[in-house]
Structures are given as structure tokens and as C-alpha cells.
Amino acid sequence: MKIAIVGTGYVGLVTGTCFSEMGIDVTCVDVQESKIENLKKGVIPIYEPGLEDMVHRNYTAGRLKFTTDLEECLDDVEVVFSAVGTPPDEDGSADLKYVLEVARTIGRNMNKYVLVVTKSTVPVGTAQKVKSTIQKELDERNIQIEFDVASNPEFLKEGD
């Protein structure tokens, strides 16, 4: 199985690394080129016990890859986890702009079935918004491709 994790912050990097540790091929995607280049060099931006060794081991083994280009890996993966930030909006609600941008990118570039899993902590109803956003992009491309959307929000306490 091959998966992509969009977002290499605490949730995305730990999730992707743990999947790769289980033998799954993982591509971690982030828009910050410097972050991706640092990860390729073994510079881990967060602290979690054992994470640095796991990243190194799985990157060296080829099970863990890093890129800034989600489009390039969509044809190879079966599952895309969206673990992007949801900063508070002016009214305190979760700002979904990054979550929906991931959905737009998937809809604009997917060519086969994919399961989209939202890991970001988001309000009820977000899965339907993600599904509608992807479907709108597919409709604009005038193609029909099956896909599913699931929610697997992360609630955690970051390491000390």
C-alpha cells in the first residue's frame, strides 16, 4: 500500500513515520520547501521520543519520502491523509482554507480512486465540504472518478 500525508507538522510527520515503520510506503508532502529539504537531510522540526531514528531508518529504507508536490504522487497512492493546519478564524472557528486547498488539489489532479482522510481537527460537516470540493473540481474537468472521504481527527498532547 502507498499513502500520502499532506502536512509535515506534528500530526502529519508522526503519522507518516509510524505508517512507514509498519512497512507502508509513505510520501509526506508540505508546501514549505525548506522544511522538506531539512527532512531529507534528517533535520526533524519537532520533538517526539524515537521519531528522529524512525525517520532516518525509514527514509534510508525508501519507505518514507518527502516532497512539495502532491500532484506528483497522486497517481501512486491509494490514500491521502490531510494533516494540515486549521488555525482559528477571526470568530474563533477553525479556518478550513488549507483543508479545502488540499481537496481542490486532489480534485484537479486525481486520475484514479483515492480515499481522502482528514486528520486535521475540524468541525462536524467538514467531510462533506471536502467531498463537495473534490467533486466540483472533477465536474470542472468533466470526468467521473470514484473517491471516498473519511474523518480521523487527531487529538493529542505534543511531546515535552
Protein language model features and the residues they cover:
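Conserved N-terminal Rossmann-fold NAD(P) cofactor-binding segment
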Residues: 25, 31-79, 85-93, 133-146
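Short, intrinsically disordered, charge-balanced linker/junction segments flanking boundaries
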Residues: 158-160
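Glycine/serine-rich loop-strand microenvironments at binding/catalytic pocket rims
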Residues: 10, 16-23, 27, 68-86, ...
